[in-house]
């Protein structure tokens, strides 16, 4: 039943597992991290109390946190006043409820994102269907920014929650820009100038092109639309009550001119860069950090040529070389070395998750059916072409992170 205790618990666990840490200079977990008390709140460690300034137009935006096709989202208006507010934990709610006793949490909005206005071409399309309203970005507000800057200057940490409102995503809501809309970039720039360590929480269901003030922040977290208990999950991650485990299912361009940006590029294109920029994205498919360090070694593929009906069987050693536990997502990609038609340079074929305590290692087995290595040939037929392949295994789709091992598929029959 929606809204029941089991439903809320499931949402919390899904949110915890989906948060993606993209940058961390060591500021996270805050104050080195905490253990939880019986109520789930961070237990103080005897250190000095801290102040966390929670700022941004989405820090306490309950409805946008739910994402598209939720009640009152614009695509689903069956709940005119939105989901019940007391069922939703925003980032501000989560931090207020989970910081150690004695810590202070302050709040400033800092910026507005948008207002809505009637379409200047009229209220109806020629066929009589209603035209949706159009978005008008809000200009930076000096008073709101000044309030946020004052909060940041009076804090030990600033958590800036920015991104997209529900009017900027979903059916009929595509945007021409991938930048943060409204006064958000000016807000981040002003917060960065204070020198207070800034954690940027990006609440957006599509990849955005981020300003330097976000890319260079002390930490950057992509949370997508984490649902009703998302604010608690985010607070737990910031405080070290849970470990970061999410990985990007999309790529983030560094500049809008790089679009389309995706990991499984077709090989054979002429060159790998623009005159003024490489094709390397800001963040790639599969990226995601943890609070520890992990090493991959000794990728091994079972010897022997394979038939199209066989399975590639491989093993890799994964070791937690840091001081905190980790849930590591081991990603396996396949590259068909020579194809009869243009095809993706590599494609994700499998992944495995392994829990590792500090200092521990594990041998992770990866099985990839050869049938999953098919391409669509010049006749439009899906087929596994015999020849040489490469298995690539690592923590991300980025080439420099992947171990490689060859395997060969023999002709059928």
Predicted regions and their residues:
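Hydrophobic beta-strand signal
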Residues: 159, 313, 363-365, 390
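Short glycine/proline/serine/threonine-rich loop/turn segments at secondary-structure transition edges
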Residues: 372-388
């Amino acid at each position: 039943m929606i809204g029941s205790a089991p439903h809320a618990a499931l949402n919390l666990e899904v949110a915890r597992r989906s948060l993606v840490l993209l940058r961390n200079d060591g500021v996270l977990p805050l104050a080195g991290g905490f253990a939880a008390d019986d109520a789930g709140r961070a237990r103080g460690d005897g250190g000095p109390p801290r102040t966390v300034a929670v700022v941004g137009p989405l820090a306490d935006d309950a409805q946008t946190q739910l994402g598209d096709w939720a009640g009152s989202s614009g695509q689903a208006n069956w709940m005119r006043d939105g989901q019940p507010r007391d069922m939703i934990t925003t980032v501000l709610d989560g931090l207020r409820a989970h910081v150690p006793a004695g810590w202070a949490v302050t709040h400033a909005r800092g910026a507005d994102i948008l207002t809505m206005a009637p379409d200047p071409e009229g209220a109806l399309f020629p066929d009589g269907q209603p035209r949706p309203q159009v978005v008008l970005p809000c200009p930076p507000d000096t008073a709101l920014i000044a309030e946020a800057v004052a909060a940041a200057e009076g804090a030990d940490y600033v958590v800036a929650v920015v991104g997209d409102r529900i009017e900027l995503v979903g059916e009929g809501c595509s945007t021409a820009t991938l930048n943060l809309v409204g006064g958000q970039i000016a807000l981040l720039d002003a917060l960065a100038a204070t020198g207070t360590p800034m954690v940027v929480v990006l609440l957006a269901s599509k990849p955005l092109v981020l300003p330097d003030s976000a890319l260079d922040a002390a930490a950057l977290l992509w949370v997508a639309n984490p649902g009703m208990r998302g604010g608690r999950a985010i607070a737990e991650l910031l405080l070290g009550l849970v470990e970061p485990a999410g990985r990007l299912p999309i790529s983030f361009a560094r500049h809008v001119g790089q679009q389309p940006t995706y990991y499984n590029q077709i090989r054979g294109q002429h060159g790998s860069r623009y005159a003024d920029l490489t094709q390397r994205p800001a963040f790639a498919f599969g990226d995601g950090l943890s609070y520890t360090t992990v090493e991959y070694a000794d990728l091994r593929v079972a010897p022997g040529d394979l038939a199209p009906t066989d399975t590639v069987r491989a093993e890799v050693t994964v070791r937690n070389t840091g001081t905190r536990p980790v849930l590591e997502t081991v990603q396996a990609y396949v590259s068909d070395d020579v194809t009869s038609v243009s095809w993706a340079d590599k494609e994700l074929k499998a992944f495995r998750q392994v829990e590792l305590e500090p200092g521990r290692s594990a041998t992770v087995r990866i099985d990839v059916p050869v049938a999953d290595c098919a391409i669509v040939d010049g006749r439009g037929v899906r087929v596994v072409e015999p020849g040489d392949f490469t298995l690539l295994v690592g923590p991300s789709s980025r080439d420099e992170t992947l171990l490689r091992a060859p395997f060969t598929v023999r002709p059928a029959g």
